Design a protein with these regions (language model features):
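Ligand-binding clefts/hinges and TM-proximal coupling segments of bilobed small-molecule sensing domains
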Residues: 120-137, 169-173, 204-226
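Periplasmic-binding protein-like
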Residues: 13, 87-92, 162-205, 221-226
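Short amphipathic alpha-helical coupling segments at ligand-binding clamshell hinges
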Residues: 30, 34, 104-108, 192-206, ...
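Short glycine-rich His-centered loop
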Residues: 4-29
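Short loop->beta-strand "edge-of-pocket" segments that line small-molecule binding or catalytic clefts
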Residues: 4-13, 100-119, 130
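Short helix-initiation/N-cap motifs at beta->coil->alpha
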Residues: 15, 32-33, 47-58, 130-144
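Acidic, polar ligand-binding/catalytic clefts
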Residues: 32, 36, 40, 45-105, ...
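Short, Asp-centered acidic motifs that coordinate Mg2+ and/or phosphate
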Residues: 8, 62, 66-67, 148-149, ...
Length: 226
């Protein structure tokens, strides 16, 4: 794989603390930092694309993107290549204590659009109303009473609960199957780029075993994510 060339990288623009714009208008996030570090290690210049999962997936399909840090495009898409996991997350439900739970008929459950959790929510709670949107949109709906429960991965969930707005909410004690409890998150690489996949896996392994990945994650998380 030639060094010194541009690497077209896609990230979600609406998923704090993984990728988001802070109050000062600066791009931040664990995945953003990791992607920038990966480009540097590969000797490539990052060319960024931020958008919805649907937009990023189209970019991989049409060749305008080389890879995306959007493992929430599950189930895994046929023809794309996937790295080894760079973190593990678990699903959780967030709601108001004493409020309507997800197993109650007519419960409104918010789920990040395009994620594997949409399918699982429909399977777990067939009588519920599933509402999809960005993380920011769903959090606003939860705060305003537009949804009863937020079904989300715990990285984004705990980040919200630690904010002032999250103080009136809590994690709901809901049992899940083993696959939902722990999910490995991967970089998706466009079809045919086995050389790029091998390089990504090599650098992710170095970051993991050297402790650099853990040190970087401490900027956003207070617990081990791998």
């Amino acid at each position: 794989m030639a060094a010194g060339k541009e690497l077209h990288v896609g990230l979600t623009d609406e998923y704090p603390p993984l990728s988001y714009v802070d109050a000062n208008g600066q791009r931040r996030g664990f995945e953003f930092d990791l992607a920038a570090d990966l480009c540097r290690r590969l000797g490539r210049t990052c060319v960024w694309t931020f958008g919805t999962q649907e937009k990023l997936l189209r970019g991989l399909r049409d060749g305008s993107l080389d890879l995306i840090f959007a493992q929430r495009l599950e189930p895994k898409q046929e023809g794309l290549l996937y790295s080894t996991p760079y973190y593990h997350s678990r699903a959780m439900c967030i709601g108001r204590p004493g409020g309507r739970g997800p197993d109650e008929a007519g419960a409104r459950i918010g789920v990040y659009r395009g994620s594997v959790l949409v399918q699982r929510a429909r399977g777990f709670w067939p009588e519920a109303i599933i509402v999809t949107g960005s993380v920011q949109e769903l959090i606003e709906r939860l705060k305003q009473g537009g949804i009863d429960v937020l079904f989300i991965n715990d990285l984004a969930g705990y980040a919200f609960l630690l904010t002032d707005a999250g103080l009136e909410f809590d994690r709901l004690d809901i049992p899940f199957d083993a696959e939902t409890r722990a999910t490995g998150s991967c970089v998706a690489v466009r079809a045919g780029r086995h050389d790029l996949l091998a390089a990504v896996n090599r650098e992710l392994k170095t970051l993991l075993y050297s402790g650099e990945l853990h040190n970087r994650s401490r900027n956003y998380f207070q617990y081990i994510i791998y």
